[in-house]
């Protein structure tokens, strides 16, 4: 998904660092968030939806399709919980969550360029939904690539300092030596991206 707004303005609109670099660190900004006049309930719901779309870099069509799938799901989870699970279990999001990429945008680029395998098969579709016990691996030929050198050094430091389990999500297991990610469980409510208010988004689409 491509946005045509200037990057800094987009971050100020949502008051979130969407690009993961120091350049867009809003804690160092002297400027106020871009805010419109007091919003109606519909306006609040719309803003929550826009934030979620921009955090996961999805088009309206893609994002709405996750709501439709969640609404039709006959599981024990609520619609908003199922919707978050669909978002969290995207391949590009899992790679980002495992700290194999600094941002979701970077993770999507890595997947699109076939840098990873899923269950030892090369993949290049960021939206693939992973399942419990799936194994994602960095391809061998890229482990020595300069592109990944700094990232791998960061992973090694995480591992040495015992910060690894904290930095990666509880529902995934990362092997920092083999450079693999194993899906251990379906993400629970406490594992979701906490800044998002998916209930408001469900209310928006339910109208």
Regions found by a protein language model. Name each.
Residues 1-98, 125-207:
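Ferredoxin-like alpha/beta domains used as RNA- or RNAP-binding modules
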Residues 97, 112-113:
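The C-terminal cap of the DNA-recognition helix in HTH/winged-HTH DNA-binding domains
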């Amino acid at each position: 998904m491509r946005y045509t707004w200037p990057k800094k303005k987009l971050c100020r609109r949502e008051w979130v660092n969407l690009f993961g670099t120091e350049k867009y660190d809003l804690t160092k900004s002297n400027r106020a968030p871009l805010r419109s006049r007091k919003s109606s309930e519909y306006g609040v719901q719309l803003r929550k939806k826009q934030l979620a779309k921009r955090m996961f870099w999805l088009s309206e069509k893609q994002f709405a399709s996750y709501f439709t799938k969640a609404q039709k799901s006959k599981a024990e989870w609520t619609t908003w919980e199922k919707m978050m699970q669909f978002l969290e279990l995207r391949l590009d999001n899992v790679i980002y969550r495992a700290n194999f990429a600094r941002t979701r945008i970077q993770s999507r680029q890595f997947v699109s360029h076939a840098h990873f395998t899923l269950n030892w098969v090369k993949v290049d579709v960021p939206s693939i939904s992973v399942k419990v016990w799936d194994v994602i691996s960095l391809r061998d030929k890229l482990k020595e690539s300069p592109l990944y050198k700094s990232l791998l050094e960061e992973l090694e430091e995480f591992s040495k300092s015992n910060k690894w389990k904290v930095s990666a999500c509880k529902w995934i297991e990362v092997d920092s030596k083999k450079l693999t990610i194993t899906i251990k469980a379906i993400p629970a409510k406490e594992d979701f991206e906490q800044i998002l208010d998916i209930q408001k988004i469900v209310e928006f689409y339910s109208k």
